[in-house]
């Protein structure tokens, strides 16, 4: 990639229909883990106008009121009025869970290559990434896209912008100069709203646009990056019909929003609703942990990690490090340090990151990475000093 370029990432709010589905799936996972953290969970959710469908595979000793968990999640998000297309009090909730296949369970319970360890719950490849563009070691476009929709929800819930409704999307186009963030070229923010905020079906009131720019966008974005920035606020105009009424929502459809905004590859596996025996989730978290510690240690300005697994096998098929020329030691040497300092077998990941806890609903909106939440152990840099010393820095 050239040193001077534009790069764009997007995010969506907790009221976006796909994120409603993700949050219900992870709320159900948490409710199960509160009683039985050894459960096997693959909870999928569909949301539509006035309807929630819960399906997937769950093996557990927990007794959970799945319908109530779904309703509570919808209420917390803010869908408490039939005018919004779904109302937690009156929506229909269908429960269609099966148990995990015994054929899968036998390979997960006892790895074929190490019977004292658990095997991977499926084959697949996962990526982790970190860079020095923000203090959180995340790419700037996705980091700030998340913060925009997070602030939209905050101002909606605390009543400062009472005309906002739950569904919203953001997009940040960053201008890079010499490979580093220089300024923000364009910000797009589309938010659901009360009907009285549009002048015509294709034009919003000037006061609405001003409130979005002054109360949501400018307080979030660094002032030094706002140089001739374009602001596109509800560019198609009226956005009253939204959430599950505007679009059917499904678990796992926002995998780029959930990760790095397109700044690195994605293996294709979604996170929400999956217990950590599923390496789609746990190994992606571990790969972020590894990459972040490498950058925090000063071994590279940016770092991409790929790991891959075979179902029922504990050891990863590969651990590949790519620093795009920013590493201070060879990538192959960094990969050796990864193998030395990080146990990337499924059971090792679960122990290393303490993943058998009800911590997942919080991950299901505003990004799984780059958030300094105490439960997000994969964001810690506890191995940075050891890596730096081992590299001789």
UniProtKB/Swiss-Prot annotation:
Alphabetic keyword roster: ATP-binding, Cytoplasm, Magnesium, Metal-binding, Nucleotide-binding, One-carbon metabolism, Potassium, Transferase
Free-text remark on how the cofactor is bound: Binds 2 divalent ions per subunit.
Lineage top rank: taxon: Bacteria
Record's catalysed reaction(s): L-methionine + ATP + H2O = S-adenosyl-L-methionine + phosphate + diphosphate
Residue sites binding K(+) per the record: 44
UniProt: ATP binding residues: 16, 167-169, 238-239, 247, 253-254, 270, 274
Role description: Catalyzes the formation of S-adenosylmethionine (AdoMet) from methionine and ATP. The overall synthetic reaction is composed of two sequential steps, AdoMet formation and the subsequent tripolyphosphate hydrolysis which occurs prior to release of AdoMet from the enzyme.
Family: Belongs to the AdoMet synthase family.
Protein's recorded name: S-adenosylmethionine synthase
């Amino acid at each position: 990639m050239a040193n001077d370029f534009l790069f764009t990432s997007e995010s969506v709010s907790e009221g976006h229909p796909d994120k409603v589905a993700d949050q219900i799936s992870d709320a159900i996972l948490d409710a199960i883990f509160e009683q039985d953290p050894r459960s096997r969970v693959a909870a999928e959710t569909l949301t539509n106008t006035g309807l929630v469908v819960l399906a997937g595979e769950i093996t557990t000793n927990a007794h959970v009121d799945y319908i109530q968990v779904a309703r509570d999640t919808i209420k917390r998000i803010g869908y408490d009025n039939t005018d919004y297309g779904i109302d937690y009090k009156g929506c229909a909730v269908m429960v269609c869970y099966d148990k995990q296949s015994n054929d899968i369970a036998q390979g997960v319970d006892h790895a074929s290559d190490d019977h004292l360890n658990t095997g991977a719950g499926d084959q697949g490849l996962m990526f982790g990434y970190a860079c020095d563009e923000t203090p959180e070691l995340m790419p700037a476009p996705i980091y700030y896209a998340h913060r925009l929709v997070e602030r939209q929800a905050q101002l909606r819930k605390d009543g400062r912008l009472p005309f906002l409704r739950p569904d919203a999307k953001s997009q940040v186009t960053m201008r890079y100069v010499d490979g580093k963030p220089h300024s923000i070229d364009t910000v797009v923010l589309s938010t659901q709203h009360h009907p009285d905020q549009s002048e015509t079906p294709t034009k919003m009131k000037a006061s609405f646009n001003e409130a979005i720019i002054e109360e949501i966008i400018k307080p979030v974005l660094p002032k030094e990056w706002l140089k001739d920035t374009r602001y596109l606020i509800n560019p198609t105009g009226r956005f009253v019909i939204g959430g599950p009424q505007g679009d059917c929502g499904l678990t796992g459809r926002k995998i780029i929003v959930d990760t790095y905004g397109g700044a690195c590859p994605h293996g294709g596996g979604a996170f929400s609703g999956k217990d950590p025996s599923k390496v789609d989730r746990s190994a992606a978290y571990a790969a972020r942990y590894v990459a972040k510690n490498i950058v925090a240690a000063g071994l590279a300005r940016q770092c991409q990690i790929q790991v891959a697994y075979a179902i029922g096998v504990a050891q990863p098929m590969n651990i590949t490090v790519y620093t795009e020329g920013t590493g201070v030691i060879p990538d192959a040497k960094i990969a050796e340090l990864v193998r030395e300092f990080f146990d990337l077998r499924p059971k090792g990941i679960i122990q290393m990151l303490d993943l058998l806890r009800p911590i997942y609903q919080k991950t299901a909106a505003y990004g799984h990475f780059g958030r300094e939440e105490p439960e997000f152990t994969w964001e810690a840099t506890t191995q940075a000093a050891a890596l730096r010393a081992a590299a001789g820095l």
